[in-house]
Amino acid sequence: MQDSLTLQPIALVDGTVNLPGSKSVSNRALLLAALAEGTTRLTNLLDSDDVRHMLDALKAIGVKYSLSADRTCCEIVGQGGPLNAKEPLELFLGNAGTAMRPLAAALCIGNGDVVLTGEPRMKERPIGHLVDALRQGGAEVEYLEQENYPPLRVKGGFSGGEVTVNGSVSSQFLTALLMAAPLAPNDTRIVIKGDLVSKPYIDITLKLMATFGVVVENNDYDTFHISGQQQYQATREYLVEGDASSASYFLAAAAIKGGTVKVTGIGRNSMQGDIHFADVLEKMGASVEWGDDYIACTRGDLNAVDLDMNHIPDAAMTIATTALFAQGTTVMRNIYNWRVKETDRLTAMATELRKVGAEVEEGHDFISITPPAKIVFAEIGTYNDHRMAMCFSLVALSSSPVTILDPKCTAKTFPDYFEQLARLSHLA
Protein backbone atom coordinates (compact mmCIF):
# COMPACT_ATOMS: atom_id res chain seq x y z
CA MET A 1 0.00 0.00 0.00
CA GLN A 2 1.55 3.28 -1.12
CA ASP A 3 1.83 6.08 1.45
CA SER A 4 -0.46 9.00 0.76
CA LEU A 5 -1.28 12.41 2.19
CA THR A 6 -4.62 14.17 1.69
CA LEU A 7 -4.53 17.96 1.87
CA GLN A 8 -7.83 19.63 2.77
CA PRO A 9 -8.82 22.86 0.98
CA ILE A 10 -6.75 25.85 2.12
CA ALA A 11 -8.50 29.24 2.41
CA LEU A 12 -5.46 31.42 3.08
CA VAL A 13 -1.66 31.20 3.23
CA ASP A 14 0.30 33.74 5.22
CA GLY A 15 3.62 33.89 7.07
CA THR A 16 7.37 33.44 6.74
CA VAL A 17 9.46 30.44 5.66
CA ASN A 18 13.18 30.12 6.33
CA LEU A 19 14.30 28.17 3.29
CA PRO A 20 16.46 25.06 3.53
CA GLY A 21 19.85 25.38 1.81
CA SER A 22 20.03 25.15 -1.97
CA LYS A 23 20.64 21.65 -3.33
CA SER A 24 22.59 23.00 -6.32
CA VAL A 25 24.85 25.08 -4.09
CA SER A 26 25.20 22.44 -1.32
CA ASN A 27 26.49 19.64 -3.53
CA ARG A 28 28.82 21.89 -5.54
CA ALA A 29 30.24 23.44 -2.36
CA LEU A 30 30.80 20.02 -0.75
CA LEU A 31 32.77 18.76 -3.74
CA LEU A 32 34.86 21.93 -4.10
CA ALA A 33 35.59 21.96 -0.35
CA ALA A 34 36.71 18.32 -0.61
CA LEU A 35 39.09 19.18 -3.49
CA ALA A 36 40.43 22.34 -1.81
CA GLU A 37 43.54 22.97 0.28
CA GLY A 38 42.47 23.63 3.89
CA THR A 39 39.32 23.26 5.98
CA THR A 40 35.97 24.74 4.95
CA ARG A 41 32.97 25.22 7.19
CA LEU A 42 29.66 25.17 5.30
CA THR A 43 26.56 26.52 7.08
CA ASN A 44 22.87 26.21 6.11
CA LEU A 45 23.81 23.05 4.20
CA LEU A 46 20.72 21.26 2.90
CA ASP A 47 19.91 18.05 4.78
CA SER A 48 18.26 15.88 2.13
CA ASP A 49 18.72 12.60 0.25
CA ASP A 50 20.75 14.14 -2.59
CA VAL A 51 23.19 15.81 -0.21
CA ARG A 52 23.51 12.66 1.91
CA HIS A 53 24.49 10.73 -1.22
CA MET A 54 27.26 13.26 -1.91
CA LEU A 55 28.46 13.14 1.72
CA ASP A 56 28.45 9.32 1.77
CA ALA A 57 30.43 9.21 -1.48
CA LEU A 58 33.04 11.68 -0.23
CA LYS A 59 33.44 9.67 3.00
CA ALA A 60 33.89 6.42 1.03
CA ILE A 61 36.63 8.08 -1.05
CA GLY A 62 38.41 9.09 2.17
CA VAL A 63 37.38 12.72 2.70
CA LYS A 64 37.14 13.64 6.39
CA TYR A 65 34.33 15.86 7.63
CA SER A 66 32.19 16.49 10.71
CA LEU A 67 28.48 17.31 10.68
CA SER A 68 26.40 19.16 13.28
CA ALA A 69 23.53 17.24 14.92
CA ASP A 70 20.98 18.79 12.54
CA ARG A 71 23.28 18.11 9.55
CA THR A 72 23.16 21.73 8.33
CA CYS A 73 26.71 22.65 9.35
CA CYS A 74 29.63 20.69 7.89
CA GLU A 75 33.35 21.11 8.41
CA ILE A 76 35.32 19.50 5.56
CA VAL A 77 39.03 18.83 5.51
CA GLY A 78 40.07 19.35 1.90
CA GLN A 79 42.29 16.89 0.04
CA GLY A 80 44.32 19.69 -1.54
CA GLY A 81 43.94 18.12 -4.97
CA PRO A 82 42.24 15.28 -6.87
CA LEU A 83 40.16 12.60 -5.17
CA ASN A 84 42.17 9.38 -5.09
CA ALA A 85 40.34 6.19 -4.15
CA LYS A 86 42.78 3.86 -2.38
CA GLU A 87 40.96 0.65 -3.36
CA PRO A 88 38.23 -0.23 -5.88
CA LEU A 89 34.95 1.33 -4.75
CA GLU A 90 31.29 1.34 -5.66
CA LEU A 91 29.44 4.58 -4.92
CA PHE A 92 25.63 4.48 -4.76
CA LEU A 93 24.29 7.95 -5.60
CA GLY A 94 20.53 7.40 -5.48
CA ASN A 95 18.90 9.66 -8.05
CA ALA A 96 21.19 12.63 -7.38
CA GLY A 97 22.30 14.15 -10.69
CA THR A 98 24.16 16.84 -8.72
CA ALA A 99 26.32 14.05 -7.24
CA MET A 100 26.57 11.64 -10.20
CA ARG A 101 27.74 14.08 -12.89
CA PRO A 102 30.31 16.16 -10.92
CA LEU A 103 31.77 13.12 -9.13
CA ALA A 104 32.15 11.24 -12.42
CA ALA A 105 34.26 14.10 -13.78
CA ALA A 106 36.21 14.72 -10.56
CA LEU A 107 37.16 11.03 -10.32
CA CYS A 108 38.53 11.20 -13.87
CA ILE A 109 41.35 13.44 -12.58
CA GLY A 110 42.50 11.29 -9.66
CA ASN A 111 43.67 7.69 -9.53
CA GLY A 112 41.42 4.81 -8.68
CA ASP A 113 38.85 2.35 -9.91
CA VAL A 114 35.40 3.59 -8.98
CA VAL A 115 31.94 2.43 -10.03
CA LEU A 116 29.20 5.09 -9.90
CA THR A 117 25.67 3.72 -9.72
CA GLY A 118 22.24 4.66 -8.39
CA GLU A 119 18.51 3.98 -8.33
CA PRO A 120 16.77 2.48 -11.39
CA ARG A 121 15.73 5.98 -12.56
CA MET A 122 19.38 7.14 -12.43
CA LYS A 123 20.16 4.40 -14.96
CA GLU A 124 17.66 6.08 -17.33
CA ARG A 125 19.17 9.57 -17.02
CA PRO A 126 21.62 10.28 -19.86
CA ILE A 127 25.31 10.86 -19.13
CA GLY A 128 26.78 10.07 -22.57
CA HIS A 129 27.56 13.70 -23.46
CA LEU A 130 29.68 14.04 -20.31
CA VAL A 131 31.46 10.73 -20.86
CA ASP A 132 32.23 11.67 -24.49
CA ALA A 133 33.85 14.92 -23.31
CA LEU A 134 35.83 13.20 -20.52
CA ARG A 135 37.13 10.60 -23.00
CA GLN A 136 38.25 13.38 -25.38
CA GLY A 137 40.42 14.60 -22.50
CA GLY A 138 41.95 11.15 -22.04
CA ALA A 139 39.73 9.74 -19.29
CA GLU A 140 39.11 6.02 -18.98
CA VAL A 141 35.37 5.54 -18.50
CA GLU A 142 33.25 2.48 -19.29
CA TYR A 143 29.52 1.83 -19.28
CA LEU A 144 28.63 -1.22 -17.18
CA GLU A 145 25.08 -1.69 -18.47
CA GLN A 146 23.51 0.49 -21.16
CA GLU A 147 25.65 2.68 -23.45
CA ASN A 148 25.32 6.41 -22.54
CA TYR A 149 23.76 5.75 -19.11
CA PRO A 150 25.03 4.94 -15.60
CA PRO A 151 26.36 2.82 -13.98
CA LEU A 152 29.89 3.89 -14.97
CA ARG A 153 33.35 2.63 -14.10
CA VAL A 154 35.87 5.47 -13.89
CA LYS A 155 39.65 5.01 -13.79
CA GLY A 156 41.10 8.52 -14.03
CA GLY A 157 43.21 9.69 -16.98
CA PHE A 158 41.69 13.10 -17.81
CA SER A 159 44.57 15.42 -18.72
CA GLY A 160 42.86 18.44 -20.33
CA GLY A 161 43.14 19.70 -23.91
CA GLU A 162 40.24 20.71 -26.13
CA VAL A 163 36.94 18.97 -25.40
CA THR A 164 33.52 19.48 -26.93
CA VAL A 165 30.40 18.98 -24.84
CA ASN A 166 26.78 19.01 -25.94
CA GLY A 167 24.98 21.67 -23.91
CA SER A 168 21.44 21.04 -25.14
CA VAL A 169 20.34 18.30 -22.70
CA SER A 170 21.69 19.21 -19.27
CA SER A 171 23.93 21.97 -17.94
CA GLN A 172 25.23 19.52 -15.32
CA PHE A 173 27.61 17.99 -17.88
CA LEU A 174 29.34 21.35 -18.31
CA THR A 175 29.25 22.01 -14.56
CA ALA A 176 31.00 18.69 -13.96
CA LEU A 177 33.76 19.45 -16.49
CA LEU A 178 34.27 23.00 -15.22
CA MET A 179 34.74 21.90 -11.61
CA ALA A 180 37.19 19.10 -12.46
CA ALA A 181 39.29 20.84 -15.15
CA PRO A 182 41.43 23.13 -12.93
CA LEU A 183 43.01 20.02 -11.36
CA ALA A 184 44.01 18.50 -14.73
CA PRO A 185 47.73 18.51 -15.63
CA ASN A 186 47.12 20.63 -18.77
CA ASP A 187 44.87 23.56 -19.67
CA THR A 188 41.35 22.68 -20.82
CA ARG A 189 39.30 24.41 -23.48
CA ILE A 190 35.63 23.44 -23.43
CA VAL A 191 33.63 24.06 -26.60
CA ILE A 192 29.83 24.01 -26.31
CA LYS A 193 27.87 22.23 -29.03
CA GLY A 194 24.19 23.11 -29.46
CA ASP A 195 22.27 25.64 -27.35
CA LEU A 196 23.33 25.63 -23.73
CA VAL A 197 20.30 24.96 -21.48
CA SER A 198 19.78 26.24 -17.93
CA LYS A 199 22.57 28.86 -18.17
CA PRO A 200 21.92 30.26 -14.67
CA TYR A 201 23.09 26.93 -13.23
CA ILE A 202 26.45 27.46 -14.95
CA ASP A 203 26.64 30.85 -13.24
CA ILE A 204 26.22 29.10 -9.87
CA THR A 205 29.13 26.81 -10.75
CA LEU A 206 31.40 29.67 -11.86
CA LYS A 207 30.57 31.77 -8.77
CA LEU A 208 31.33 28.88 -6.43
CA MET A 209 34.59 28.07 -8.22
CA ALA A 210 35.61 31.72 -7.76
CA THR A 211 34.72 31.51 -4.05
CA PHE A 212 37.19 28.62 -3.82
CA GLY A 213 39.86 30.60 -5.68
CA VAL A 214 39.58 29.44 -9.30
CA VAL A 215 38.59 31.77 -12.14
CA VAL A 216 37.35 30.50 -15.52
CA GLU A 217 37.55 32.41 -18.79
CA ASN A 218 33.98 32.35 -20.12
CA ASN A 219 33.60 33.44 -23.75
CA ASP A 220 29.88 34.17 -23.96
CA TYR A 221 28.97 30.59 -22.92
CA ASP A 222 30.34 29.29 -26.26
CA THR A 223 33.81 28.32 -25.04
CA PHE A 224 35.44 28.16 -21.62
CA HIS A 225 39.17 28.20 -20.89
CA ILE A 226 40.50 26.72 -17.65
CA SER A 227 44.19 26.70 -16.68
CA GLY A 228 45.47 23.34 -15.44
CA GLN A 229 47.47 22.46 -12.32
CA GLN A 230 45.47 24.85 -10.15
CA GLN A 231 44.42 24.37 -6.57
CA TYR A 232 41.12 25.24 -4.95
CA GLN A 233 41.55 27.14 -1.67
CA ALA A 234 39.27 26.44 1.27
CA THR A 235 36.95 29.23 2.29
CA ARG A 236 36.85 29.41 6.09
CA GLU A 237 33.11 29.85 6.38
CA TYR A 238 30.56 29.66 3.59
CA LEU A 239 26.82 30.26 4.03
CA VAL A 240 24.74 28.21 1.58
CA GLU A 241 21.89 30.39 0.34
CA GLY A 242 18.30 29.15 0.57
CA ASP A 243 16.92 26.96 -2.21
CA ALA A 244 15.18 29.16 -4.79
CA SER A 245 13.41 26.19 -6.40
CA SER A 246 11.97 25.30 -2.98
CA ALA A 247 10.88 28.93 -2.54
CA SER A 248 8.69 28.69 -5.64
CA TYR A 249 5.93 26.65 -3.94
CA PHE A 250 5.42 29.15 -1.11
CA LEU A 251 5.58 32.19 -3.39
CA ALA A 252 3.07 30.59 -5.77
CA ALA A 253 0.77 29.68 -2.87
CA ALA A 254 0.78 33.34 -1.82
CA ALA A 255 0.05 34.48 -5.39
CA ILE A 256 -2.97 32.15 -5.44
CA LYS A 257 -4.32 32.39 -1.87
CA GLY A 258 -2.38 35.06 0.04
CA GLY A 259 -2.09 36.97 2.36
CA THR A 260 1.58 37.49 1.98
CA VAL A 261 4.29 34.88 2.21
CA LYS A 262 7.88 35.90 2.79
CA VAL A 263 10.72 33.45 2.06
CA THR A 264 14.09 34.18 3.69
CA GLY A 265 17.55 32.96 2.74
CA ILE A 266 17.41 34.27 -0.84
CA GLY A 267 16.94 37.76 -2.20
CA ARG A 268 17.61 40.12 -5.07
CA ASN A 269 21.34 39.25 -5.10
CA SER A 270 20.92 35.47 -5.04
CA MET A 271 23.13 33.49 -7.45
CA GLN A 272 20.31 31.08 -8.35
CA GLY A 273 18.44 31.68 -11.58
CA ASP A 274 15.27 30.24 -10.05
CA ILE A 275 14.67 33.52 -8.16
CA HIS A 276 13.34 34.76 -11.53
CA PHE A 277 10.32 32.55 -10.86
CA ALA A 278 9.04 35.52 -8.85
CA ASP A 279 9.17 37.67 -12.01
CA VAL A 280 6.79 35.21 -13.69
CA LEU A 281 4.34 35.45 -10.77
CA GLU A 282 4.52 39.22 -11.13
CA LYS A 283 3.75 38.98 -14.86
CA MET A 284 0.75 36.81 -13.94
CA GLY A 285 -0.58 39.51 -11.60
CA ALA A 286 0.82 38.85 -8.12
CA SER A 287 2.77 41.54 -6.27
CA VAL A 288 6.36 40.78 -5.34
CA GLU A 289 8.70 42.59 -2.97
CA TRP A 290 12.47 42.01 -3.14
CA GLY A 291 14.86 42.39 -0.20
CA ASP A 292 18.54 41.52 0.16
CA ASP A 293 17.66 38.39 2.14
CA TYR A 294 14.00 37.79 1.34
CA ILE A 295 11.34 37.69 -1.36
CA ALA A 296 7.71 38.36 -0.42
CA CYS A 297 4.68 37.65 -2.57
CA THR A 298 1.09 38.84 -2.15
CA ARG A 299 -2.03 37.57 -3.91
CA GLY A 300 -3.30 39.11 -7.13
CA ASP A 301 -5.84 38.16 -9.81
CA LEU A 302 -3.76 35.83 -11.95
CA ASN A 303 -3.71 35.77 -15.74
CA ALA A 304 -2.13 33.20 -18.02
CA VAL A 305 1.35 33.73 -19.53
CA ASP A 306 3.12 32.39 -22.63
CA LEU A 307 6.86 32.28 -21.90
CA ASP A 308 10.19 30.61 -22.66
CA MET A 309 11.17 28.97 -19.35
CA ASN A 310 14.50 27.41 -20.28
CA HIS A 311 16.31 29.56 -17.71
CA ILE A 312 14.21 28.31 -14.73
CA PRO A 313 13.50 24.64 -15.52
CA ASP A 314 12.90 23.46 -11.94
CA ALA A 315 10.84 26.39 -10.69
CA ALA A 316 8.92 26.47 -13.98
CA MET A 317 7.15 23.27 -12.93
CA THR A 318 5.46 25.29 -10.20
CA ILE A 319 3.98 27.59 -12.87
CA ALA A 320 2.26 24.54 -14.38
CA THR A 321 0.12 24.04 -11.27
CA THR A 322 -0.21 27.80 -10.65
CA ALA A 323 -1.77 27.94 -14.15
CA LEU A 324 -4.79 26.08 -12.71
CA PHE A 325 -5.67 29.34 -10.92
CA ALA A 326 -5.02 31.78 -13.81
CA GLN A 327 -7.47 33.17 -16.38
CA GLY A 328 -6.70 31.81 -19.84
CA THR A 329 -4.25 29.31 -21.33
CA THR A 330 -0.68 29.24 -19.99
CA VAL A 331 2.06 28.05 -22.36
CA MET A 332 5.55 27.11 -21.16
CA ARG A 333 8.13 26.75 -23.91
CA ASN A 334 11.68 25.44 -24.44
CA ILE A 335 11.52 22.99 -21.53
CA TYR A 336 12.70 19.79 -23.23
CA ASN A 337 15.11 19.13 -20.37
CA TRP A 338 12.11 18.38 -18.09
CA ARG A 339 12.17 15.01 -19.87
CA VAL A 340 15.58 13.98 -18.50
CA LYS A 341 15.03 14.91 -14.84
CA GLU A 342 13.87 12.75 -11.90
CA THR A 343 11.11 11.50 -14.21
CA ASP A 344 9.90 12.60 -17.65
CA ARG A 345 8.36 15.69 -16.10
CA LEU A 346 6.53 16.85 -19.23
CA THR A 347 4.51 13.64 -19.53
CA ALA A 348 4.05 13.32 -15.76
CA MET A 349 2.83 16.91 -15.43
CA ALA A 350 0.40 16.59 -18.36
CA THR A 351 -1.01 13.31 -17.01
CA GLU A 352 -1.64 14.61 -13.49
CA LEU A 353 -2.99 18.04 -14.54
CA ARG A 354 -5.62 16.27 -16.64
CA LYS A 355 -6.72 14.31 -13.52
CA VAL A 356 -7.74 17.53 -11.76
CA GLY A 357 -9.71 18.66 -14.83
CA ALA A 358 -7.27 20.81 -16.81
CA GLU A 359 -7.11 20.75 -20.60
CA VAL A 360 -3.47 20.07 -21.51
CA GLU A 361 -1.45 19.91 -24.70
CA GLU A 362 1.96 18.29 -24.32
CA GLY A 363 4.56 18.93 -27.03
CA HIS A 364 8.14 17.77 -27.52
CA ASP A 365 9.45 20.78 -25.56
CA PHE A 366 6.35 22.72 -24.43
CA ILE A 367 3.16 22.35 -22.43
CA SER A 368 -0.04 24.39 -22.63
CA ILE A 369 -2.54 24.38 -19.76
CA THR A 370 -6.13 25.62 -19.71
CA PRO A 371 -7.66 25.50 -16.22
CA PRO A 372 -11.00 23.78 -15.58
CA ALA A 373 -14.08 25.73 -14.48
CA LYS A 374 -13.78 23.79 -11.22
CA ILE A 375 -10.79 21.76 -10.02
CA VAL A 376 -11.81 18.19 -9.17
CA PHE A 377 -10.46 15.86 -6.49
CA ALA A 378 -7.74 13.46 -7.65
CA GLU A 379 -5.06 11.13 -6.36
CA ILE A 380 -1.80 12.51 -7.75
CA GLY A 381 0.99 10.15 -8.75
CA THR A 382 4.41 11.62 -7.94
CA TYR A 383 6.74 9.33 -9.96
CA ASN A 384 9.33 9.36 -7.15
CA ASP A 385 9.85 13.02 -8.09
CA HIS A 386 10.06 15.52 -5.22
CA ARG A 387 8.92 18.41 -7.41
CA MET A 388 5.75 16.64 -8.60
CA ALA A 389 4.70 16.20 -4.97
CA MET A 390 5.39 19.82 -4.05
CA CYS A 391 3.84 21.31 -7.21
CA PHE A 392 0.59 19.41 -6.80
CA SER A 393 0.21 20.43 -3.14
CA LEU A 394 -0.96 23.76 -4.63
CA VAL A 395 -4.15 22.07 -5.85
CA ALA A 396 -5.37 22.25 -2.22
CA LEU A 397 -5.60 26.04 -2.67
CA SER A 398 -8.85 25.31 -4.56
CA SER A 399 -12.20 24.30 -3.05
CA SER A 400 -11.24 20.64 -3.52
CA PRO A 401 -8.93 18.44 -1.43
CA VAL A 402 -6.06 16.61 -3.15
CA THR A 403 -4.29 13.35 -2.33
CA ILE A 404 -0.53 13.17 -2.91
CA LEU A 405 0.83 9.64 -3.31
CA ASP A 406 4.28 8.89 -1.82
CA PRO A 407 4.62 12.34 -0.19
CA LYS A 408 7.94 11.34 1.39
CA CYS A 409 9.62 11.67 -2.02
CA THR A 410 10.13 15.35 -1.11
CA ALA A 411 13.07 14.11 1.03
CA LYS A 412 15.24 14.47 -2.09
CA THR A 413 15.43 18.23 -1.46
CA PHE A 414 12.92 19.27 1.22
CA PRO A 415 12.10 16.63 3.87
CA ASP A 416 9.73 18.82 5.94
CA TYR A 417 7.97 20.54 3.04
CA PHE A 418 4.43 19.51 4.00
CA GLU A 419 4.96 20.60 7.64
CA GLN A 420 6.14 24.02 6.44
CA LEU A 421 3.15 24.37 4.10
CA ALA A 422 0.74 23.41 6.92
CA ARG A 423 2.31 26.04 9.20
CA LEU A 424 1.36 28.80 6.71
CA SER A 425 -2.07 27.39 5.85
CA HIS A 426 -5.49 28.37 7.21
CA LEU A 427 -7.99 25.67 6.24
CA ALA A 428 -11.27 26.50 4.55
Curated annotation (Swiss-Prot):
The keyword Transferase applies. It catalyses: 3-phosphoshikimate + phosphoenolpyruvate = 5-O-(1-carboxyvinyl)-3-phosphoshikimate + phosphate. Its main location: cytoplasm. 3-phosphoshikimate binds at residues 23-24, 28, 170-172, 198, 314, 337, 341. The active site is at residue 314. GO terms for cellular component: cytoplasm. Pfam families: EPSP_synthase. Phosphoenolpyruvate binds at residues 23, 97, 125, 172, 345, 387, 412. Monomer. This is 3-phosphoshikimate 1-carboxyvinyltransferase. The lineage of its organism: Bacteria, Pseudomonadati, Pseudomonadota, Gammaproteobacteria, Enterobacterales.
